[in-house]
Amino acid sequence: MSRVLLVNPPFYRFLGSHYNASSLGIAYIASHLNANGHDAWLYNADYVNRQSYANLDEMFSQYSNYKEYFNNEDADIWNEVVEKIIEFQPDWVGYTSYTANVNTIDIISRKLKQRLPSVQQIIGGVHATLDPRVLEEVPAVDFAVR
């Protein structure tokens, strides 16, 4: 069957912190896919191997750095995420979305499409459900699950 990688894109890492919990929604999807013969895995691109988190003041002080990542698509984090996805050798990549990470998904999906054009990319989650124009916002993504 298919190799599927379900991705929680980075967000908190841009603000000098991280998010080490798994996304429950994509965990449910991976479980269902695995139970039906697919090889599905999760990739939390916000994961950092440390126990301490930045407080809100520290995160807000990093906002200018956050904006810089979106002005520099050659930043290490973009290449890191795309390389991790490629290492998995997926047939399908699914992204969980909320409004704050749609630009992140756009950059990652475009870079991935350049490197692996045969990989099918899907966006789901809150933003994809609520915004009927989501595929216009992330044109490298092939399908939206609403």
Segments the model singles out, each with a brief description of its role:
Residues M1-V4, D39:
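Residues that mark the start of a beta-strand
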Residues R3-S17, W92:
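Nucleotide-activated donor-dependent transferases that construct or modify glycoconjugates
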Residues P9-P10, S22-S23, P90, P132:
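Proline-rich low-complexity regions
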Residues Y12-L24, S97-V102:
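A short, glycine/small-residue-rich beta-strand->loop->alpha-helix junction that serves as a flexible
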Residues A21-N34:
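Short catalytic helix/loop segments, enriched in acidic residues and glycine
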Residues S23, E58-S64, V138-V141:
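Short, hinge-like loop/turn segments at secondary-structure boundaries
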Residues H32-L33, W41-N49, F70-R146:
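Glycine-rich beta-alpha loop elements in corrinoid/cobalamin-binding modules
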Residues N49-A75:
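Charged, often glycine-rich, active-site loop that binds/positions anionic groups
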